[in-house]
From Swiss-Prot:
Top-level taxonomic group: Bacteria
Gene3D superfamilies: Dihydrodipicolinate Reductase, domain 2, NAD(P)-binding Rossmann-like Domain
Listed transmembrane segments: none
Residues bound to D-glyceraldehyde 3-phosphate: S153, C154, T155, T184, R199, T212, G213, R235
Keywords: Cytoplasm, Glycolysis, NAD, Nucleotide-binding, Oxidoreductase
Gene that specifies this protein: gap
Full protein name: Glyceraldehyde-3-phosphate dehydrogenase
Length: 337
């Protein structure tokens, strides 16, 4: 029997998580309802026509206040308080919480009050939740007691699989990350006030340094790296696809060849298959649009100085890769119902 999923918040990640569910019937997930304050007509149109990922290949129509995708009716609501959503009536098992608002235990618990069994937050948690998961690294740690789970961030999902392999095979003393990140909705189209004055500037006109907790958050899934990592983000004028540039001190002398070898082996086998990618080609960001991997190692960029300072670069579609991990993590949570 399919696991029934609700999506709360139908923005970039909400819409793409819906696409990912619908494109992957093998996941065992069934999308039954969407909650968003926008009009059903507007949401249906934006779901069908995506500037980064193209037109949805199936049919998308509306029927009254609901959406019909590939002939299947999806109940649509516009409720501000998640506690009032019809989760119990619809038999919702897992909520994908994609608003960016209900990101702690207290707020996300409203979905449990409404009758859902578990909640997967599409963002780093603000405060304690039952578990933060990066699929491919610690997803097998999920238990029946994990009711409210964070899927971390797109950047943590890119970085953590790479670091997981490096920590196991070589060891990491300390490291710094820079993510060269496409602009997001948390920036301004034209100069306008923002709590971060750099993000207040026109997103399409500048490279914009800003903060990120993605590197530090890796410690939530790889505890032995706590306090050993930090990083920054540089937002750039592209609508999708980002890269992580990670420099680290290895625990022992290493070479670029060894680093590439262990990362390629991990990409080809085991839990990292489909999560971690690897390429020898001279690719650019446009080549990674709609790539479902969490991260793809660019072997041409791997470098080591005197065996004691190393650099690894990995690409990621910060929208589609992350949305696919939402599906994977939800499917893993379903096994604990």
């Amino acid at each position: 029997m399919a696991v029934k999923v609700a999506i709360n918040g139908f923005g970039r990640i909400g819409r793409l998580a819906a696409r990912a569910i619908l494109s992957r019937p093998d996941s065992g997930l069934e999308l039954v309802t969407i909650n968003d304050l926008g009009s059903v007509e507007g949401n249906a149109f934006l779901f069908k026509r995506d500037s980064a990922h193209g037109t949805y290949p199936g049919t998308v129509t509306t029927e009254g206040n609901d959406m019909v995708i590939d002939g299947k009716k999806i109940v649509v609501t516009a409720e501000r308080d998640p506690a009032n959503l019809p989760h119990k009536k619809l038999g919702v098992d897992i909520v994908m919480e994609c608003t960016g608002i209900f990101t702690n235990t207290e707020k996300a618990s409203a979905h449990l009050t409404a009758g859902a069994k578990k909640v997967l937050i599409s963002a780093p948690a603000k405060g304690d939740v039952d578990r933060t998961v990066v699929y491919g690294v610690n997803h097998k740690d999920l238990t029946a007691d994990d009711k409210i789970v964070s899927n971390a961030s797109c950047t943590t999902n890119c970085l953590a699989p790479v670091l997981h392999v490096l920590q196991q095979k070589i060891g990491i003393v300390r490291g710094l990350m820079t993510t060269v990140h496409s602009f997001t909705n948390d920036q301004r189209i034209l100069d306008q006030i923002h709590s971060d004055l750099r993000r207040a500037r026109t997103a399409s006109a500048s490279m914009i340094p800003t903060s990120t907790g993605a590197a530090r958050a890796v410690a939530l899934v790889i505890p032995e790296l706590k306090g050993k990592l930090d990083g920054i983000s540089i937002r750039v004028p592209t609508p999708d696809v980002s890269l992580v540039d990670f420099t680290f001190v290895p625990q022992r002398d290493t070479t670029a060849e060894e680093i590439n070898s262990v990362l390629k082996a991990a990409a080809d086998t085991g839990d990292m298959t489909g999560v971690l990618g690897y390429t020898d080609e001279p690719l650019v960001s446009r080549d990674f649009y709609s790539d479902p991997h969490s991260s793809t190692v660019d072997s041409r960029e791997t470098a080591v100085l005197e065996g004691k300072l190393a650099r690894v670069v990995a690409w990621y579609d910060n929208e589609w890769g992350f949305s696919n991990r939402m599906v994977d993590t939800a499917a893993q949570m379903a096994k604990t119902l």
